[in-house]
Amino acid sequence: PAPFEQGSAKKGATLFKTRCAQCHTIEAGGPHKVGPNLHGIFSRHSGQAEGYSYTDANKRAGVEWAEPTMSDYLENPKKYIPGTKMAFGGLKKAKDRNDLVTYMLEASK
């Protein structure tokens, strides 16, 4: 996959609303939905949001979430963590992933 490059947080916010927000919240104290709240994700490993029921695959994967790993994961989640229950086909365009990850970095702090 293409390496992560800083993108547009504004475009990333739109992508989050249209592609992620139906299953995830990202603000501090946001509830878990179908997927876990993503606040603080960049200081965690996969399968570690408190109070969320993960698949064993996510817990075992031990992915440390940083810009490059998040971008790679979002390209094809089921290939990156086989057995994940995240029902998302992925973002194929590197630019979209860069924008989304740039937004997530800011919004999840």
From Swiss-Prot:
Places the protein is found: Mitochondrion intermembrane space
KW Lipid metabolism (keyword) present: no
**Alphabetical keyword list:** Electron transport, Heme, Iron, Metal-binding, Methylation, Mitochondrion, Respiratory chain, Transport
Q: Name one Pfam family in it.
A: Cytochrom_C
Q: What post-translational modification information does the record give?
A: Binds 1 heme c group covalently per subunit.
Q: What gene name is given for the protein in this entry? A: CYC1
Q: What does this protein do?
A: Electron carrier protein. The oxidized form of the cytochrome c heme group can accept an electron from the heme group of the cytochrome c1 subunit of cytochrome reductase. Cytochrome c then transfers this electron to the cytochrome oxidase complex, the final protein carrier in the mitochondrial electron-transport chain.
Where is heme c annotated to bind? 20, 23-24, 86
Gene Ontology CC terms, in alphabetical order: mitochondrial intermembrane space
- Extract the PROSITE patterns matched here: CYTC
Record InterPro entries: Cyt_c-like_dom, Cyt_c-like_dom_sf, Cyt_c_1A/1B
Residue list for modification N6,N6,N6-trimethyllysine: 78
Q: Which family does it belong to?
A: Belongs to the cytochrome c family.
Which molecular function GO terms apply here?
Answer: electron transfer activity; heme binding; metal ion binding
Tell me where it mainly resides: mitochondrion
User: Under which name does UniProt file this protein?
Assistant: Cytochrome c
